[in-house]
Each structure stands twice: as C-alpha cells, then as structure tokens.
Amino acid sequence: MVAGLTSGGLELRIVPLGSSRPLLVLPLETGELFTIHYVHSVENAPIWEVHSVDAEGRIYIEEERYRKFGAGMGRMPGVGRLVRRGEYEVITDMHMPTGDFVLRIGSPGVDHTLVWRGTRTNLSALAPHRAVRFAARKVSFLHQLWRMVISHGATPG
C-alpha cells in the first residue's frame, strides 16, 4: 500500500482556463524536456522554447532558440548564455523557474506546437485563441503504473 502512495513520476497537464478537461497529459521523468514551437506573429520566424520539470513538479525554461530578436524576444541579463547554432540565436543554460504558466494559443499559422518524445501536437489546431495552463504535478507510483497500462486519452502517441 505504501508503495502505491510514493512518488512514481510526474505529469504535465495542459488545460484550457475555465475547464477541467485537459488538451494534453504528458507523463514525464524528472528533468525530461518538452518544447513549445511556434511562428512569431510579428517577425514570422520560428521560435523554440525548451522546458523541463524538476522532481517537485516545478517547470523551468532551459533554452530559447530563434533566428533573430523580435518583439518580446531577447536576452535577460544574468540568465543563460547566448550562442549561435547555424542561423539561430540560442540562449542556453537558462534553468529559469516559470512555475505553472498560462499560454494564449495562437491561430493556425502561429502553430503553437508541443514537441514531446518525438510527437508533435499542434495546439493551434486544437484550441486556437484559447488560454491554457501548463501545470506539472507529482503522481503516485500506482498512478504511473496505471498510465503505463492504460494511457490517458489526452496523451499523444
């Protein structure tokens, strides 16, 4: 019984504000990465934001990658390290806590897309113009085991 109550892992839930039904539910391991990819609405250039979740369920931004600084983009003094990867500016080593956060999903064309374990889910196709909360939580070993047998209907792949 005690084993069922101990921590079994993490779960990231992406839920529209005002709803209890998640768009996505992602099982995660401590430190595992997920990415939000979209096209900047002003600059019309691709952006990648790489996030992680720690053992307590706190969300961090780890890296941002883009072609050029655009409106709302850019470096924060004292956070991360700016490098170039080909044509992209990349802020690495950020490990900046965001906690749970709200994202207003853009329209098709902005294509807010969640990338996780080789899957890509276009949030703009699922819920354009909706505000959604990204929230992570610890789950019990029994919950994790259950989800290994029967995945949540909102888990991609």
Please tell me what each predicted stretch does.
Residues 1-7:
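Hydrophobic membrane-insertion alpha-helices, especially the h-region
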Residues 7, 19-20, 41, 52, ...:
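Generic serine detector
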Residues 9, 24-25, 102, 109:
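Generic ordered-secondary-structure signal
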Residues 12-68, 72:
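N-terminal secretory signal peptides
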Residues 59-61, 73-157:
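Mature, soluble, non-transmembrane domains
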